[in-house]
Amino acid sequence: MQTRTNSSRWTQEHNATATQADAWFENYRFHDGESLARLRIHYATLGSPHRNAQGQIDNAVLVIHWTGADGNTLLSKNYMEALFAPGRPLDANRYFLIFPDNVGHGKSSRPSDGLKAAFPKYGYGDMVDLQHRLVTETLGIEHLHAILGMSMGGMNAWQWAEAYPNATDGIMPVVSMPIPISGRNMLWRRMVIDAIRSDPQWNGGNYTSPPQGWLSAFPLMRMMLDGVPHLQVVVPDGPAADRFIAEAQSQAAAVGTRGDKDQGVRTQLCRR
C-alpha cells in the first residue's frame, strides 16, 4: 500500500522533482519474531524511471542514509550539488533515485510513535528486508542499477550484496566495511546508550519526553568520530575547543529533535 504526500522541488535548473511517499506493510514480522500490525516506510524519489525493452525499470539507484539521519538528509543542497546535479555521478536526469527512511528513523515507523520500549527490536537485517520490499513490492523494480550507502547505509549495502546478490549491478559502500562494529565505532555507541539509560528521564524506555542527559556527553563521542590529524587543525587552541564543543552539542540537539536516538543507536549496535 502506498500513499503520497506533497512533493518538494529541487531548485537546480532543469532537474527533477523529489516526491515524498509512504509504503505500508501489514503484519510485518521482524527477524527476532516480534511483529507490528502496520509498519510505515517513508521514502523520497528523485528523477524518473526508465524502462527497457522488456518494460522493466533499469535506472534505479537506492541511496541509504547513516545512523540517526533520514532520506531527506541526502536531499540537502550539499549532497544535491555533489552527487545528483546535472553531470554529477548520480545525475537525477539519468537515474531514478530512491531515498528510504529506515525503520526507526525519519518519518518511518519508530518507537516514539507511541510504543516506545514496547516497539519491536529491529536490526540491520530488518532494514534491508524492508528496503527490498519497498523496491520490489511497492515500486515494482526487479533489478537496481546500484546501491549507495553511507556508514550504516554502507553496511546495509554490503548486506544487500549477500542477501540479494543478483538484485543490483553493484554497491557503493562509503565509510563502511563488511565486518562487525568494533573499536571507536562500538565505543561511541556504547557511550550514547549508557548516557541514555542512566538518565532518569529514560524510565526504562517508557519516557514521557526524550532523555537529554546524553547531550552533555556527545562532544566526547563527536571527537571519537574525527581523526587526530584533523582535530589538530580545527582545534588549535582553547577558543577553538569551546567552539567545537558548542557545535557538537548543537548537532546532538538537532538529532534529538528528529526522534529515537535511544532506540535507534541501541538497535544498530545489537542487531545486524
Where are the model-predicted features located?
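Short glycine-enriched nucleophile-adjacent loop
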Residues: G154-P165
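Conserved alpha/beta-hydrolase "nucleophile elbow" surrounding the catalytic nucleophile
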Residues: G149-S151
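Catalytic-loop region of hydrolases
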Residues: M1-A60
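Catalytic nucleophile-loop/oxyanion-hole region of alpha/beta-hydrolase
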Residues: G114-D126
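Alpha/beta-hydrolase fold catalytic core
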Residues: G238-R272
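N-terminal cap/lid subdomain of alpha/beta-hydrolase-fold enzymes
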Residues: A44-D113
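Conserved acidic catalytic loop of the alpha/beta-hydrolase fold
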Residues: G125-A146, Q159
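Alpha/beta-hydrolase-fold enzymes
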Residues: A167-T168, P173-Q251
